[in-house]
């Protein structure tokens, strides 16, 4: 535990179709440092086309991969992705942040089929000088509730508590931005080929 209770390490977990990957990042220095990595293959039929076919096997592999890095925490950062996640950038009337949640639910109903079966989140985006005083740009994210709940069950069975659940594309972007901040001023293309 760091000063004032801030943790010095973060454990990141990526569950791919063929591999479970765990990374331990130390935040005690001026820049984050990758200190441990473990990669464990999954059986061929454990995850097929992004759908978990055998949750018990997947949770066992996750548990073993976490143990391989000897992480002294069971709190991890995980992500969801694939065709069951919808990301939309929308323009809407400018409102105060506390009113935004209700407005985003209404906006989601316009963009997401069966809004009652998804988990919603949003981020109000900062505009560089071109923003209208009456409008705001918002990134709206919807993930199928079944997908999120299935991921949480697998993590729970593995004895893991997610500190946060991100979208895999955002996690890739954030990792790039932290490691290559100067590249963010130009055009950048990131490709997640996966395995």
Predicted segments, located by residue:
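Short, solvent-exposed secondary-structure boundary motifs
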Residues: 1-5, 112-113, 180-182, 191
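Active-site neighborhood for divalent-cation/phosphate handling
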Residues: 75, 79-181
């Amino acid at each position: 535990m760091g000063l004032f209770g801030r943790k010095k390490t973060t454990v990141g977990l990526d569950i791919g179709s063929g591999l479970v990957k765990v990374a331990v990042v130390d935040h005690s220095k001026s820049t984050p440092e990758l200190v441990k990595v473990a990669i464990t293959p999954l059986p061929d039929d454990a995850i097929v086309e992004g759908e978990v076919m055998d949750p018990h096997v997947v949770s066992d592999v996750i548990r073993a991969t976490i143990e391989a890095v000897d992480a002294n925490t069971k709190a991890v950062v995980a992500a969801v992705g694939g065709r069951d996640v919808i990301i939309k950038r929308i323009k809407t009337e400018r409102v105060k942040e506390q009113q935004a949640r209700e407005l985003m639910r209404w906006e989601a109903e316009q963009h997401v089929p069966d809004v009652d079966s998804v988990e919603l989140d949003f981020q109000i985006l900062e505009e560089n000088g071109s923003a209208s005083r009456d409008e705001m740009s918002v990134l709206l994210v919807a993930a199928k509730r079944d997908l999120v709940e299935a991921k949480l069950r697998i993590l729970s069975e593995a004895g893991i508590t997610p500190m946060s659940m991100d979208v895999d594309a955002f996690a890739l972007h954030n990792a790039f931005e932290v490691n290559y901040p100067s590249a963010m001023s130009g055009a950048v293309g990131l490709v997640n080929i996966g395995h």
